[in-house]
Structures are given as C-alpha cells and as structure tokens.
Amino acid sequence: MTTGQGGRQDQLWVSAARFDELVADALDGIPAPLARAMNNVVVLTEDSHPEEPDLLGLYEGVPLTERTLDYAGNLPDRITLYREPLMSFCADEDELVHEVMVTVVHEVAHHFGIDDAALHELGWG
C-alpha cells in the first residue's frame, strides 16, 4: 500500500487514458525476469480508493512468498493505482511519470513478498 503525503496547490490533471499509458510504461520498465515471475496478478487503475482517498496504490492478494502447494484456482491478485491522489501529489507530468513508476515498483514488490520496511531500506518506500 502506498499513500500520498499531501496534495499540491498547482493541480496536475491527466486523462484516465493517459494515466493508463503511464502505468503501462512503468510496467514495461519492469525487468523481464521479474515480469515473467509475476504470477496470477492483474494491474488496474481507478480514480481513487473509496475509503482511503490519499492512497496511491494497493496490492491485494497472496504474495508469492506465502503461496503454498495448494494455491490453485484463485482469482488474480490485484494491483491498483489511483489516478487522482497520484495527480494531486505531483506538480507536472514528469513527476507523475516518476511517482507512477515508484508506486508500480512498490506494489509489485508486495506481490513478491517484500514488505514496506524492506522497501524503505532499499529506497523505494
């Protein structure tokens, strides 16, 4: 889970379609061996989380490190990136590109079983 740290006064706006492109570009930047190792996960975008409006991204599922031999037939894990809080966190599209990439890395890391403490130690918190 990634949360913002307060909005900015100069509100950036990008369309939902453009935001989807930025997320797709960030996913394309994941090294091929890691992308191939992502198992049973879907990446979605939404305007905002209904209960936590400052949430930038959210991983929901069973991390690869916690899956057992009987893990089968489950619905895909979900990584959701939230457009509105990410826009409010950024002053321009270049900053948004960076924050989308950081958020994608953060949530994909959770899929691989990397927790927030380890992400902070690695500089991705």
Segments from the language model and where they lie:
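Short hydrophobic/aromatic patches at helix-to-coil boundaries
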Residues: E121-G125
